[in-house]
Amino acid sequence: WEIDPATRKVKAKITVGREPVAMASFAGDSCLLIANNMPEMPSTAYPLAAQLDIVDVSSKKVASRIMLPNGSTDVKSIAVDKNRAYAYVTHLIARYQLPTNQLDRGWMATNTLSIIDLKARKLLTSVLLDTPQKGAANPWSVIVTPDDKQIIVAAAGSQELVRIDRIALHERLAKAKQGVMVTPSVKSWNNIPNDAGFLYGIRDFIPTQGKGPRSVVATGNKIYTANYYTSELVSMDMNGKNLNKQVLGAPLAFTKVGKGDMYFHDATICFQNWQSCATCHPNDARMDGLNWDLLNDGMGNPKNTKTLLLSHQTPPCMATGI
């Protein structure tokens, strides 16, 4: 919606994709990049992924669309650099075409940062926030620090911040584009979205010492994040050191409902922090728009993820009657 701040009235409504959740301006504020949370095509389509919309502000119409990699869902946040040359988008890449028989190395889901070339208006590539042995589950907010040197992602499921050397990232991408084997695991440019080793050496993890870091900001020489479930404001220096916490009110986790919601979104109780319940059932335990082949009714019959809303009162939960 375009709202006139003087009259507080809606001036225009612009139709975009499914469940828009974030936006950022670029091209001298003449365009908006819109993040749509969910895939909008049928779950039997290919590719099946959430899309970004580029809105022309003057015409108030979608000028073009950018599709994220196949399996992309639960898009959360957008950040841009100072020059507005690149945008960084947090989301999941679900490996929904594989059987759900293991979690190792992101077999079911990987946690992703997609990089958008705003001048070319296309997807540059997507990099995995995970390592081969550890997930950075449920990436939420993303920022670029004021000096443009770091990208910070709040990994809400694994209870940490992911700190990436932005300068080194783009240098590595430029070399990989030329065919240089920038890390031992890099096989080709097109394989980067599947390579959990691509960020090796230029990314670290900063535990927030609480539950549910969903937002992150950086001002001056400080990084701030908020632990949603434990009601804490956390500050640290730009290197992720000298961490301080301040409790703000009664933690949500003190209530029975809040504690259950916390566990639902907590990937630290999962093998190697790869995923939480919210990975497949985001947005208050709803669906992710994908088909999955769960093994409790055999293999080879993928079905659309169901919302969990009232599912305990409406059995059976599987399409085959289980």
Residue ranges and their predicted role:
Residues I3-R8, V55, S59-K61:
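Extracytoplasmic/lumenal domain signature
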Residues T15-G17, F26, A35, V55-S58, ...:
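A structural detector for beta-sheet-dominated domains
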Residues V10-A24, M38-E40, P47-A50, V62-S77:
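Asp-box/WD-like beta-propeller blade repeats and closely related beta-sheet repeat scaffolds
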Residues P5, E19-V21, I34-D53, V89-Q102, ...:
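Beta-propeller blade termini and top-face loops
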Residues R8, S64, K76-Q102, A109-T112, ...:
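Periplasmic c-type cytochrome electron-transfer domains
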Residues S25-A27, D56-S59, V80-Y86:
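A short, structured loop/turn motif at beta-sheet edges
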Residues I3, S25, D53-V55, S158:
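Gly/Ser/Thr-rich loops at beta-strand to alpha-helix junctions
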